[in-house]
């Protein structure tokens, strides 16, 4: 069902973009289980570390994880008046499951939920659906006519769109293939220890698939898992080329770039950069740099299209970023959420962060300054996933605008229109007065191993998602 928002006057859109100060920031154990985050054995730091900010009335600043920081503030950029507004276009609602994954391509939107159904939407109306029978759909990526889905049960399904009927989807296989599983099972050396007293084939994930990332140029698919590994697949023949023992806890996010670099974020509190080398028909990934080591779980990653900036979100509600010139250098921290950051997307000069606090923060990058353009509110549950597409109609008018899809555990997908030239003036005024929402300077020293020692650890137990 599509709920129209076009009947709302444009002047009222600004009212949608302020967080409700009365929203509860309490996350119950039931909610933790509901959005698929499991506790880690890693120790949590005490809340005494955190110096709560003084602006209690500010919706943006009510985070229980906000803390004092040694970094200096940057100045807010000036904004123009009479700029286009951001706002809700509509909602896609089908009361059958929490939304865990999204993927947008051309005029189609794919949504995955814990109902085991994958639904396809076109022009904001339900267009098609197909059942996967393989557990909660945690990730969806699209490569040409192929759709890859990652599942809670550790499986990766491959689907194809019918060339005669775009609404028909047929499962074309599973990764790894049954043939490869059979061949690998004949050799004892292909079994690795995945848990105490438990072994499994190295080509199979032994726990939930948390994230998928495509490198279309190289024809590769990356899958991250709670089994602490990243696996590399060749799309052409569905072969598993490599299994990377990447982290000491669940891998929550993986992003492949066009420059042979892969980034991974984990519940162990680290973000790692991997260098990909081609060795004949196979790949070899070596660790380049550990970007951060912190107590809070890394829950989301995003990389700008040109690879100039890497963003990661954490269970403490913070978004950190690195800037890349000749090497990766720590750039700053964005504070906009009061609960865990669950998803990130970068589009043009904008950064979008979705959170368990039910909001989406929209940031604009200009050099080393990030301005919070607006806070999109409307979901009644944690925002679990985001997808962003260029607004083609706005592009024709030379107005750089984006269509943002947000999936939530409230069982809905909301559709937003966001302009790069719009700034919520009320939000900006509040930020300036409190001087709390800011980007920090490049003053923090790096450790000898090249990693940044972050003090942004949180007392949250939301480590896997």
UniProtKB/Swiss-Prot annotation:
Disruption phenotype: No visible phenotype under normal growth conditions, but hyperactive pollen germination. WD repeats lie at residues 94-131, 132-169, 204-243, 246-284, 293-332, 336-373, 378-426. The keyword Transmembrane helix does not apply. GO terms for biological process: pollen germination. PROSITE patterns: WD_REPEATS_2, WD_REPEATS_REGION. InterPro entries: G-protein_beta_WD-40_rep, JINGUBANG-like, WD40/YVTN_repeat-like_dom_sf, WD40_repeat_dom_sf, WD40_rpt. Residues 21-30 have a biased composition (Polar residues). A motif (Nuclear exporting signal) lies at residues 344-346. Changing residue 344 to A: Increased nuclear localization. Keywords: Cytoplasm, Nucleus, Repeat, WD repeat. Negative regulator of pollen germination. Prevents pollination in moist environments by inhibiting jasmonic acid synthesis. Stabilizes pollen tube growth. Interacts with TCP4. PANTHER family: F-BOX AND WD40 DOMAIN PROTEIN, PROTEIN JINGUBANG. This is Protein JINGUBANG. The lineage of its organism: Eukaryota, Viridiplantae, Streptophyta, Embryophyta, Tracheophyta.
């Amino acid at each position: 069902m599509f709920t129209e928002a076009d009947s709302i006057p444009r002047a009222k859109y600004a009212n949608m973009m302020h967080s409700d100060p009365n929203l509860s920031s309490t996350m119950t154990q039931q909610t933790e289980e509901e959005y698929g985050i499991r506790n880690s054995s890693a120790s949590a730091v005490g809340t005494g570390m955190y110096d709560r900010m003084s602006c209690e009335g500010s919706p943006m600043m009510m985070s229980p994880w906000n803390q004092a920081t040694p970094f200096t503030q940057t100045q807010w950029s000036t904004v123009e008046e009479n700029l286009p507004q951001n706002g809700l276009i509509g909602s896609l609602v089908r009361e059958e499951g929490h939304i865990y994954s999204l993927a947008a391509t051309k005029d189609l939107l794919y949504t995955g939920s814990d109902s085991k159904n994958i639904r396809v939407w076109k022009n904001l109306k339900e267009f098609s659906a197909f059942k996967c029978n393989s557990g909660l759909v945690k990730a969806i990526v699209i490569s040409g006519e192929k759709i890859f889905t990652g599942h809670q049960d550790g499986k990766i399904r491959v689907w194809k769109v019918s060339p005669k009927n775009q609404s028909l989807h047929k499962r074309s296989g599973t990764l790894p293939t049954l043939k490869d599983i059979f061949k690998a099972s004949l050799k004892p050396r292909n079994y690795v220890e995945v848990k105490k007293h438990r072994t499994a084939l190295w080509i199979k994930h032994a726990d939930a698939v948390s994230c998928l990332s495509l490198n279309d140029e190289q024809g590769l698919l990356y899958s991250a898992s709670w089994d602490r590994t990243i696996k590399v697949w060749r799309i052409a023949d569905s072969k598993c080329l490599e299994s990377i023992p990447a982290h000491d806890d669940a891998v929550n996010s993986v992003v492949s770039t066009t420059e042979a670099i892969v980034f991974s974020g984990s519940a162990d509190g680290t973000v790692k950069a991997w260098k990909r080398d081609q060795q004949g028909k196979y790949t070899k990934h070596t660790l380049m740099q550990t970007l951060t080591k912190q107590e809070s779980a890394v829950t989301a990653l995003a990389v700008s299209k040109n690879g100039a900036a890497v963003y990661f979100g954490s269970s403490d509600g913070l978004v950190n970023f690195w800037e890349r010139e000749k090497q990766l250098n720590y750039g700053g921290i964005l504070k906009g959420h009061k609960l865990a950051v669950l998803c990130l997307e970068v589009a043009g000069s904008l950064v979008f962060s979705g959170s368990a606090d039910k909001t989406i923060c929209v940031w604009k990058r200009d050099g080393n300054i990030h301005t919070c353009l607006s806070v999109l509110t409307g979901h009644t549950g944690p925002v679990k996933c985001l997808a962003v597409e260029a607004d083609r109609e706005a592009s024709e008018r030379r107005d750089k605008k984006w269509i943002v899809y947000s999936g939530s555990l409230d069982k809905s997908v909301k559709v937003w229109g966001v302009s790069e030239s719009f700034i919520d003036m009320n939000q900006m005024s509040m930020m300036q007065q409190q001087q709390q929402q800011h980007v920090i300077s490049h003053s923090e020293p790096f450790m000898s191993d090249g990693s940044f020692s972050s003090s942004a650890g949180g007392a949250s137990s939301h480590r896997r998602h």
